[in-house]
Amino acid sequence: MKSLLADLFKQTLPNEEEFDAITIGLASPDKIRSWSYGEVKKPETINYRTFKPERDGLFCAKIFGPVKDYECLCGKYKRLKHRGVICEKCGVEVTLSKVRRERMGHIELASPVAHIWFLKSLPSRLGMVLDMTLRDIERVLYFEAFVVVEPGMTPLNRAQLLTEDDYLAKVEEYGDDFDAVMGAEGIRELLRTLDVNQEIERLRSDLETTGSEAKIKKFSKRLKVLEAFQQSGIKPEWMILEVLPVLPPDLRPLVPLDGGRFATSDLNDLYRRVINRNNRLKRLLELKAPDIIVRNEKRMLQESVDSLLDNGRRGKAMTGANKRPLKSLADMIKGKGGRFRQNLLGKRVDYSGRSVITVGPQLKLHQCGLPKLMALELFKPFIFNKLELMGLATTIKQAKKMVESQEPVVWDILEDVIREHPVMLNRAPTLHRLGIQAFEPVLIEGKAIQLHPLVCVAFNADFDGDQMAVHVPLSLEAQMEARTLMLASNNVLSPANGDPIIVPSQDIVLGLYYATREGVNVPGEGMLFTDVGEVKRAYESGQISLHARVTVRLKEFDRGPEGERIERVVRHNTTAGRAILSEILPAGLPFSVIDKPLKKKEISKLINASFRRCGLRATVIFADQLMQYGYRLATRAGISIAVKDMLVPDLKEDLIRAAEAEVKEIAQQYTSGLVTDGERYNKVVDIWGRCGDQVAKAMMEQLGQEPVVDRNGNTVKQEAFNSIYMMADSGARGSAAQIRQLAGMRGLMAKPDGSIIETPITTNFREGLNVLQYFISTHGARKGLADTALKTANSGYLTRRLVDVTQDLVVIEDDCGTREGFNMKALIEGGEVVEPLRERILGRVCAEDVVNPDTQETAIEAGTLLDEDMVDLIESLGVDEVKVRTPLTCETRYGLCAKCYGRDLGRGAMVNAGEAVGVIAAQSIGEPGTQLTMRTFHVGGAASRAAAASGVEAKSSGTIRFAGNMRYVANAKGEKVVIARSAEVVVADDMGRERERHKLPYGAMLLVDDGAQVKAGAQLASWDPHTRPIVTEYSGTVKFENVEEGVTVAKQIDEVTGLSTLVVIDSKRRSSSGAAKGVRPQVKLLDENGEEVRIAGTDHAVAITFQVGSLITVKDGQQVSVGDILARIPQESAKTRDITGGLPRVAELFEARSPKDAGLLAEYTGTVSFGKDTKGKQRLVITEPDGTVHEFLIPKDKHLMVHDGQVVNKGELIVDGPADPHDILRLQGINELARYIIDEVQDVYRLQGVKINDKHIEVIVRQMLRRVVITDPGDTKFIREEQVERSEVLDENDRIEAEGKLPAQYENVLLGITKASLSTDSFISAASFQETTRVLTEAAIMGKRDELRGLKENVIVGRLIPAGTGLAYHRSRRSQSAGEDLGIEHAWAPIETPAEEQHDISAS
């Protein structure tokens, strides 16, 4: 009825939905009064007897409107006919009661009050404008000091503070020549008399003249705030409130409970306090009360307004009757439960339901089983409509009755209604876009939703009690989108890496694996069959086994040039199971793809091949059939787990005995003093680690093979049909590591702190653990559980930050026309190709022509999307690196172009305009976050540590090349000792392509020559993994300097062995004499004449410094030759392998935190020398080729990677330590930085076996780089050192250059994802992310305008998002508002327009 009336009496309202931007600002007192419908004078709320609102109170009907629709308070006017009448008795306007949700009131404050947000939200805006400290302003506001507002002719300064006594003395002295005030009045006066323009002029000239960095920072901050006031037209004195707006009463309701009590919003309490104090203050002022009383009342008023706006921001929070702090206006909007995140970004939806899920193996991929009762409830309105249409019910009421009594005809209609009406299923947590998919419902009995087994991977669902929610898309458009974009059968590929996500798992894999295995001498071996049908009949009748090797004629279908099917019959020698499986193979795939035991990886490849060759439809049908077949065979196979399947290897005892003997020997060595305790521990851990691996290997060999007698009566080994082995081998369930604990030995365990306990658990679960062993293993298991809980929360928070930083990145045009790109080559690490070139460039667009290295002809033109065929071509050509387009160098402003992004991984084709690639990138990185560890979570806590490598060998045959800056010296024995810090050795194949690359540590022995031919398996270099040597490059006699026992070195006497070594001690631990603090123990070398040996080509003496912890191995006066070891630095004992691993490492990279103890990079290219040392620091000098000299001070305990006379390049590591991403960006540029972040992030994910496309990380890095710092503003509106959006600078520079003026110069700056999200141009998006108060305060002062470009802002204002189908809507809306009436079909036009026109369209 209400809505009907509203329609009848519709005034011609302007269409309020149409707006282009939202601005936020400060409200002037007049503005507040103009919003108000009356002043609230009394603190009363409701009359407790009549329940009617009190007049002039907080719920007054006269101010805020009637309580009941079209009825005044006293009841004189009722009904519609009096609309708009104002009752002369009670003063209430007769209208809809919902105006009580929008009409505001106000309170006239008896004394002005400072707004706490602008006072206390750091940095204090009031303080910045007035150039006073927060402490001073507070002293004035809370009546502890006077402030001089108008010095007059006196020597006092404006804004000077005077205490009470000062003030009285000055009044004595000057009388009323000057004006000083206390409280907010004083501050308001100062703000009112501040001349913003003049202040800006002064600051600008100060900025020009000053030289100090701190002052520049301070001035430019102040300048920014003042300019914001100047531009937005906001007056500074509005930060002081004279009128307080009152929220409409229905937004702070008062609800009567039974028993005469009321439930009320905290705001009412807060307002009541303000009104009480305000009224009391008014009365005191009228009575001319003593100053001290008035002051106290004013201070209390200030405090009550403070807590109304932001309770608890200053002093103690006001509490209600129940001692909990009251919820103020600021608390209403911030945090997870606040307005933004609770109500605007997360709403509950109608037409939805949830239930437990069960498995539905009989469903097709695009179907789900929906319980009848649920469907009935969800589709109710549709059923009512149908009943009326068919004339079975005349009224809605009648239809409702029919549905509720569930008459038979209702079920028929329900069937009809849901036909072809997709529903959306969602499983929380929705970590990526595949967490919501659409299905066609199939009505089923029972109360559980049935889910297709193949989509479980995408939903991460299992059937142990998971629940899922169902949503019904109502409008035709919504149904269409659900069907075309979200239907499960249209989402075969994972958007994170482009691999199929609809892959069989668990039982299906086991069934397929079993069906395609081969057995020796099983019934039917060697038979011949005419076709598959015959094989099937023979199998069904029990004549042959599935695993029998048979010869059979199979039909294969080739795809013709026109896509027609060409049939050919081929004889295959294969197994019966594979032959039967070949029936469901889609046309176009050769039989060879299934002619092997199908393990999980193989099946994934199979589906991928099918998708690329046969298209989506065939693949979906194929996957469904694979599933049916797999389930059927898994059932028939009857594979189960039995205790006797866990075969403990016979070799185990011997292996353990051998290891124990080795450990004993090490202990001997330790007692005789050959190794230190740390080395002994390391070696013991290594021995046990190796022993565990050997036991596991023996176990897998025994499990994986079994002896059988073949047809000729010989005993042969065949792959075992052991249930446990089959499960692990097929990838259905379990892994080698888990079987190892069942039947091998559990191995080493970690202590709570991550260090490894050196006594391993030598038994396994099959044999059983004793008490001590059980106790050792409990720790790891518990830690695993605790970790999981922490991990989920952390991973979710990372995802949230990632989404927030990228949410506004959408593909908006076809091609930005850039020539820039990224040189991609195969990723080689530790000698292995971790990621081949094909995987890195697949689905990208090449930025330059790809040239055939042999003929120098162009093989692939620039701008081509590299699909599978192209990549094959590149591989066959032997091209080493390809330059591809990347989101990092895309020149589109406020978005990305399709060419720079490349293929949409989830669809397998070029990305469409409107694709929200930012959010997809964030989801792809965040979704596997829960699989990452918080630290290192091992299988049941068993320590997995890379046994320290002691050398490298070639994995493939080829030619040796030395890379990096390889330098080595030959020692007395003729061994080559590496003395370069970043030496690498490369093995190249015959075509000169790099096949593997190994880093060599300083001090390694090189065993090959440059250019030598090596065979696979040849040893290239070796070194001691547990110590790092200090090697001399010159020969001579050792002369110690500053090597004094008890001062710089300590004699360590091993308790066990009684042998002594000299150890360099930390300067902090040296004896207190000041002189000894700064000296460094070092070695100089003397030649035969007793002269100091000089560095070749310079007059610097060779001085080799020992760093802290070195064990000095030479004696004073000893003769040394080139390549000899002077000292050893013991490496850290083996902690379980990780530095910061897992999730924290990913977060650290994306937050762009500078690592502690970061390595130092060379700022310039030049020659290194050392200057005079200062206390605790060493002075490093770099001399550029043109003679410019730069000095750096480096703490002495840092390990230098360079030596006197070495030439370094800009960006090279000088001081050892992890790299600082900010330095990389500054010294080596965007590409190097991106490469660093991508490699580091990928390392973490790769360790967990998670595949993520580099593209996604690049998208995030692009967003981290979206701000720049202005170094020289030129003629633009920017200020030096100001941080601005890159696109804004480019727009402004274009404008300025068009006028022929000087553009601004800027440099890139890297922001962490949290910082980047908060510094986005959109204040709505930033406020809904974090630090709501700070963001809104800043935005209000700047008078910011939100252009509503991103997705989040549009969700918040309740619009379609500018992505996907919404992009077209927004485009047409924009162009209409620009005055052209474009139809929707033109809305896509801008995608083809050249780049320069593009900006006008987005700008409009």
UniProtKB/Swiss-Prot annotation:
Amino acids binding Mg(2+): 462, 464, 466
Q: What is its EC number?
A: 2.7.7.6
Give binding positions for Zn(2+) 2. 816, 890, 897, 900
Q: Give the keywords, sorted.
A: DNA-directed RNA polymerase, Magnesium, Metal-binding, Nucleotidyltransferase, Transcription, Transferase, Zinc
| Positions contributing to Zn(2+) 1 binding | 72, 74, 87, 90
Q: Which GO terms describe its biological process?
A: DNA-templated transcription
Q: Which GO terms describe its molecular function?
A: DNA binding; DNA-directed RNA polymerase activity; magnesium ion binding; zinc ion binding
What Pfam families does its record include?
A: RNA_pol_Rpb1_1, RNA_pol_Rpb1_2, RNA_pol_Rpb1_3, RNA_pol_Rpb1_4, RNA_pol_Rpb1_5
Superkingdom classification of source: Bacteria
Keyword Ligase included in the entry's annotation: no
Q: Which InterPro entries match?
A: DNA-dir_RpoC_beta_prime, DNA-dir_RpoC_beta_prime_bact, RNA_pol_asu, RNA_pol_N, RNA_pol_Rpb1_1, RNA_pol_Rpb1_3, RNA_pol_Rpb1_3_sf, RNA_pol_Rpb1_4
The Swiss-Prot or TrEMBL record lists the needed cofactor(s) as:
Mg(2+); Zn(2+)
Record-linked SMART domains: RPOLA_N
Its subunit composition reads:
The RNAP catalytic core consists of 2 alpha, 1 beta, 1 beta' and 1 omega subunit. When a sigma factor is associated with the core the holoenzyme is formed, which can initiate transcription.
Function description: DNA-dependent RNA polymerase catalyzes the transcription of DNA into RNA using the four ribonucleoside triphosphates as substrates.
Family of this protein: Belongs to the RNA polymerase beta' chain family.
Q: Mind telling me what this protein is named?
A: DNA-directed RNA polymerase subunit beta'
